[in-house]
């Protein structure tokens, strides 16, 4: 038994070590530069976090974009602003580019906006202790933006971005995307198609955990109508079961039929039923009037559906439609689906990029890196382009409480995460 344990342990250690290649002299210089500029990283984070850039705050999003453009120009990038139609009420996106002929063509992803709108209480950048800071968007995702930018600056200072092709794309409405998506993500998708590898700097779920897959999301709306009448007749062939019982049957059958499937979730977020109902989809709200002795003639239920692959999404939709069709007596139900953000399905190409990251984390003394659980992340901008190129995400800041007033970032992890990003960019563009 001891022999097998030793052999197995050796196999794991040896397999992980294969990806490590050791640090070159140039890489060591980059790491030293990152360390020497760590205070600059914190200062840039503070500067950008102290500007409210909620998705609907057009002026604030543009101000953060101007700060990042200033810093990216220091790394030799040419910056431009992609405006959105006035009717969309979104600021637009920042694009920074360098063009060359060497190595992989990279597409780096950040976003300028946060969930914190101007009408919410403002939380300035504040040091909690010597290793932690709080502030709006420090974790999601201004910390990740800073990691990307400072990694690029460190590489540029050593001349390691010469003749490479990199697009750094910062959307201005990731948290609350402009509609229609066919317009708000058109430029994003077209530029990504020209690259070979996409790297997302959303928050890290662990120092050694990388997202090689992310679930997609879509919406659904269930509508039920039914015969109405006095409650004394409910369950009879004449009166039937009413809309509320039918809606309850459908939702419960969704649960019993599909809830055990890995990575598939479906959540009824709003339900309205009664004698008279009003539903406002744009505001995700509604109202109802009903009496205890009247059989409900109408119900509306809205919810989301999250999935790992397009096939899983389509299979789930087919199963849900089949459940809806089995109407109880005196009722009629229909369900409609609306696509949202596609999934970032796991692929061999994504795993190949993970192996590069694994080698880097070991070279930096942090141990092996592994793929994270796709179920622990929601959908993101990278999912719009996952069908066109190899993708990894989660290379951003380490912290907690994203989207909450007490959102934090672990400043003591900032140097390592910046070094990891810099070496990943360098190794991919020098293959």
Q: What kind of feature is each model-predicted range?
A:
Residues 117-127, 213-218, 281-286:
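Short, flexible, mixed-charge acidic loops at enzyme active sites
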Residues 1-23:
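Bacterial Sec-dependent N-terminal signal peptides
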Residues 103-170, 191-193, 405, 410-416:
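Active-site metal-coordination/substrate-binding segment of hydrolases
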Residues 21-136, 156-160:
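Acidic/His- and Gly-rich active-site-bordering loop/insert found
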Residues 116-118, 160, 212-216, 292-296, ...:
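Short glycine/proline-enriched loop/turn "hinge" motifs that connect secondary-structure elements
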Residues 21-27, 70-71, 87, 227-431:
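Metal-dependent amide/peptide-bond hydrolase catalytic core
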Residues 141-217, 276-283, 430-431:
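Acidic/histidine-rich catalytic neighborhood of metal-dependent amide-processing enzymes
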């Amino acid at each position: 038994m001891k022999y097998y344990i030793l052999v197995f342990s050796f196999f794991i250690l040896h397999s992980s070590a294969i990806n490590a290649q050791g640090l070159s002299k140039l890489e060591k210089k980059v790491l030293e530069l990152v360390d020497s500029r760590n205070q600059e990283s914190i200062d840039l984070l503070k500067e950008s976090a102290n500007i409210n850039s909620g998705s609907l705050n057009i002026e604030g999003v543009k101000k953060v974009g101007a700060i990042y453009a200033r810093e990216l120009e220091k790394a030799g990038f040419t910056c431009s602003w992609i405006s959105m139609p006035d009717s969309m009420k979104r600021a637009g996106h920042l694009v920074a580019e360098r063009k060359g002929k060497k190595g992989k063509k990279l597409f780096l992803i950040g976003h300028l906006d946060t969930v914190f709108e101007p009408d919410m209480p403002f939380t300035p950048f504040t040091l909690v202790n010597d290793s932690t800071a709080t502030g709006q968007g420090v974790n999601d995702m201004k910390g990740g933006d800073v990691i990307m930018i400072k990694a690029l600056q460190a590489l540029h200072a050593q001349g390691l971005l010469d003749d490479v092709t990199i697009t750094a794309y910062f959307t201005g409405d990731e948290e609350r995307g402009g509609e229609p998506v066919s317009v708000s993500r058109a430029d994003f998708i077209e530029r990504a198609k020209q690259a070979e590898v996409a790297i997302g700097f959303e928050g890290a779920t662990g120092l050694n955990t990388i997202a090689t897959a992310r679930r997609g999301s879509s919406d659904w709306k269930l509508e039920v109508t039914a015969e109405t009448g006095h409650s004394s007749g409910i369950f009879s062939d004449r009166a039937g079961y009413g809309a509320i019982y039918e809606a309850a049957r459908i939702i419960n059958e969704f649960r019993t039929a599909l809830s055990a499937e890995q990575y598939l979730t479906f959540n009824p977020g709003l339900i309205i039923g009664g004698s008279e109902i009003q539903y406002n989809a744009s505001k995700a709200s509604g109202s109802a009037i009903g009496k205890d002795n009247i059989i409900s003639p109408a119900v509306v239920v809205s919810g989301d559906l999250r999935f790992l692959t397009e096939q899983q999404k389509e299979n789930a939709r087919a199963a849900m439609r089949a459940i809806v069709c089995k109407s109880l007596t005196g009722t009629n139900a229909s369900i409609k689906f609306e696509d949202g953000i596609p999934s970032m399905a796991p692929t061999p190409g994504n795993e190949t990029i993970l192996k590069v990251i694994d080698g880097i984390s070991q070279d930096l003394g942090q141990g092996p890196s592994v793929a994270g659980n796709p179920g622990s992340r929601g959908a993101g901008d990278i999912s719009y382009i996952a069908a066109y190129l190899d993708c990894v995400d989660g290379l951003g800041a380490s912290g907690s409480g994203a989207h909450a007033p007490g959102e934090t970032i672990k400043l003591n992890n900032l140097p390592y995460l910046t070094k990891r990003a810099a070496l990943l960019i360098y190794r991919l563009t020098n293959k």
